[in-house]
């Protein structure tokens, strides 16, 4: 595949078809992260929790970034168009309708908004247009942020016509508008912005959902978000925590895929308008204050069983969770009963001809890492590891 496809935006700026969810059913989306550039700093090593627990290195200081696993394509920055394209190919195979861009840690005064969200977002928009021109499908976008950031997002994106085709729309009776997800500070969204969007609050671990409130994290049986007397949204998780994933006595692990299976059974039972899967590629977490007993603490991930990403990883799962997701979605969208034999099928060797269980297409496989930053050359946008993307250097 030509590098120019990934690195140069189309001059024709191919528009996408507007996607309106109003009259559709059995829609499936997934939470998606673009914050990975925050972990790449000059002279700061990539920290992998699995390797550290196996005796390979030490935990970093409080607030330092740690990956729970190495992605199958190797470590990558959040603005890497080639990796996004690889993800979108997988989403097309799995029939993912929309992705939810996680900006929940960003506020108007956040100093890293560009690196965390805005730069990856612009890369993603260009990629979607290139894919459209090439005849490839892309999921539409829903942004999820604090309500306090809604005004800035509206001024920057929602109010501009050049972005109107990338959103996922929903009509509540006053015309189809882009869906926007707020944290629980939904009251901080200015009225003039609220009127231009279809707004839902979304947070987790709340068994009693308020009006227009969705959830991204729940134990089975997951609560159902209702709207106009009908089931509107339900979350499906691979694993989840009560407070910290490192608190394994209270967290719910993957259980070799059984947690994912159980949560999907709830979706097949309820069949809401929207199923949201948690998560695709959060991948990393900051070290928190140690527990009173000295236990290192991470909020959203720790050992493989106490993590929740579906993106293919080097070890130990390969692309197993992607295959499970793909086949659950296939049956769900066809209106079939839930398949009960997937765990037995997919614990075996991958059935995907372009994967060898490391999650990398045979066409793009490669391991050379010239600058030793943990990112293989084919995905590396900062080839001298100085913290400045090559595209910005003279």
PLM regions with names:
Residues 339-394:
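Extracellular calcium-associated, cysteine-rich motifs in secreted modular proteins
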Residues 1-10:
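Bacterial N-terminal signal peptides
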Residues 14-351, 357:
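Glycan-processing catalytic domains of CAZymes
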């Amino acid at each position: 595949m030509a590098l120019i496809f990934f690195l140069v935006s189309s001059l024709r700026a191919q528009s996408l078809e507007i996607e309106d969810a109003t009259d559709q059913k059995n829609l499936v989306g997934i939470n998606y992260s673009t914050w990975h550039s925050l972990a790449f700093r000059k002279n700061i090593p990539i920290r992998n929790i699995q390797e550290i627990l196996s005796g390979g290195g030490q935990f970093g200081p409080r607030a330092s970034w740690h990956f729970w696993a190495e992605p199958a394509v190797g470590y990558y920055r959040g603005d890497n168009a080639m990796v996004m394209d690889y993800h979108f190919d997988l989403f097309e195979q799995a029939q993912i309708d929309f992705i939810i861009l996680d900006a929940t840690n960003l506020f108007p005064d956040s100093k890293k908004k560009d690196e965390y969200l805005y730069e990856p977002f612009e890369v993603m928009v260009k990629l979607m247009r290139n894919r459209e021109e090439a005849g490839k499908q892309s999921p539409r976008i829903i942004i999820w942020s604090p309500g306090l950031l809604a005004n800035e997002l509206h001024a920057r994106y929602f109010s501009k016509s050049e972005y109107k085709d990338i959103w996922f729309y929903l009509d509540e009776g006053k015309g189809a508008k882009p869906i926007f997800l707020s944290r629980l500070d939904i009251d901080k969204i200015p009225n003039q912005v609220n009127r231009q969007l279809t707004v839902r609050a979304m947070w987790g671990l709340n068994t009693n959902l308020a009006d227009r409130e969705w959830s991204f994290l729940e134990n089975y049986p997951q609560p159902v978000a209702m709207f106009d007397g009908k089931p509107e949204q339900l979350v499906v998780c691979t694993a989840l925590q009560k407070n910290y994933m490192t608190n394994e006595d209270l967290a719910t692990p993957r259980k070799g895929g059984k947690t994912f299976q159980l949560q999907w059974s709830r979706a097949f039972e309820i069949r809401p308008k929207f199923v949201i899967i948690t998560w695709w590629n959060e991948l990393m977490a900051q070290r928190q204050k140690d527990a009173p007993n000295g236990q290192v603490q991470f909020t959203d991930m720790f050992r493989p069983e106490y993590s929740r990403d579906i993106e293919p990883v080097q070890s130990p799962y390969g692309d197993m969770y992607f295959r499970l997701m793909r086949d659950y979605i296939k049956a769900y969208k066809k209106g079939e009963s839930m398949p009960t034999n997937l765990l037995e099928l997919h614990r075996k060797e991958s059935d995907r001809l372009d994967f060898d269980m490391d999650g990398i297409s045979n066409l793009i496989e490669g391991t050379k890492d010239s600058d030793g930053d943990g990112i293989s050359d084919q995905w590396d946008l900062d080839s001298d590891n100085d913290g400045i993307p090559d595209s910005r250097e003279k």
